């Protein structure tokens, strides 16, 4: 394990830092004090370097670490269960102490860090992020925020109680396109919106869905700690179909195409239309791979393709109408709008808004909106900006850790938005049945069998 001298500096510790420590203490029943003493979260002087620990150093986690480092953060500790997968990040940060178990890292580094980034598979997002929050640290977590609805609700509450700065990895939330989408819709450029279509071409060729559990049990690679990779999920033999990338298509580890891309796509209608929680959701799925030879639902992997229909009540005291939002994945898409001409086509991943005066569509990650018919653009050009522009997705969180300005996509927003995504994922457990959703009590009221999947039991040694 690489060793470096402790780089935490007493620096500047404001009254706000002491307040956050007290708030976290009250919320979680233990004492937190500033980093230079034991390691509570707080806000730094502009001149003080942010000290960060990274949980998940390969793949997206490695990309997050590289970007946040360029902003000026100092990664003093890195944790990954796969040395080969994380080798590039380890090499770029030779002085960072290395760990395999994030629980050990947080225990040993609590006095040295201000913040934690989490870039692991979906099934360990919650346990890693919650551990960091309970340690009083600011948290950046990749999308989707959690693997289950229960985890999402609990993590959102914990972040609020602790007063830490949080952000989820839906990069397009900071884009110019996302702000124009909000401003044009709210200015009435396409009129009243009651119908939305959102889609993704995933899983496609990127990972497999609609398949059964592999029967082969090859040896675990020497560089991988399979037990820690599983984390809180029930034990099963290693197979390369799961790690490092294919986990997205398996119920135990991922959230399917909807969970993987929904936070990049559904984010924008949820935000622009102020949708709030759905009142119901219903899925239809492909039969190929969805049913096993006993005519039972495939409990191992997600269907190859699905359509999920959400219903939302009217909002803002009746000023905003009810909305039906339909999600498509696995290559399924909504019909091409009649207003499209020539070689115009919908993007492979995106959103289509159907208004009373026209239509609007954009690509994933907050792509620039396009209007149908095109003549509506002249009206859109007259819409004055009403929203603050973002300095950048990662910059928002990085600056928040220093100045306490809450990021637009903090867990207070991204938590409920992720719940909407995960409710759609839940509906895949009961295709063809409309699930009535009680968001206050986090349960389906008319199909109680699916409530068992709102949270899954952790194996011994793991807790939220």
Protein language model regions, located:
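N-terminal secretory signal peptides and thylakoid transit peptides that target proteins
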Residues: 4-27
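N-terminal Rossmann-like dinucleotide-binding module
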Residues: 26-93, 172-175, 269
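Short amphipathic alpha-helix with an adjacent loop that forms part of the alpha/beta core around
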Residues: 104-111
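N-terminal Rossmann-like NAD(P) cofactor-binding module of classical short-chain dehydrogenase/reductase
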Residues: 116-117
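Beta-strand-loop-alpha-helix segment that lines the small-molecule cofactor/substrate pocket
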Residues: 121, 126-174, 188, 432
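Rossmann-like NAD(P)H-binding beta-loop-alpha module
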Residues: 176-225, 229
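Glycine-rich, aromatic-lined ligand/substrate-binding cores of catalytic
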Residues: 217, 222-405, 418-426, 430-439
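C-terminal lid/capping helical subdomain adjacent to the catalytic/cofactor pocket in oxidative enzymes
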Residues: 435-464
